[in-house]
Amino acid sequence: MNPEPVVLINAFEVPDGQEEEFLAAWERARAFLATQPGYLSTRLHRSLSPTADFRFVNVAVWQSPQAFQAATSQPEFAAAPVPFPFHASLYQVVHQDQR
């Protein structure tokens, strides 16, 4: 039996005026990670509040913690970091509701 996928939630601190720089760096990282084994999906969210501490929040789904760790340990990923402070962790879904 395969374990449930894990969810990466990554909140980014992006100063005013640096949104385009952030988006370009995030897209480079996303393009690489999307080619890695175990990658399932990602969604980037932008805050509606201009005063939010975290202007962007990425929610990605990976097949396993090991797949995520392997992908982010690749030299290609380390060579092109997203140059903004971030707060990331892997999560398990404990409840889901949908209409």
Q: Can you say where each PLM-predicted feature lies in the sequence?
A:
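Juxtamembrane helix-loop transition sites at the ends of transmembrane segments
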Residues: 32, 58-59, 64, 82-87
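Glycine-rich beta-strand-turn "strand-cap" elements at beta-sheet edges
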Residues: 1-6, 43-54, 79-99
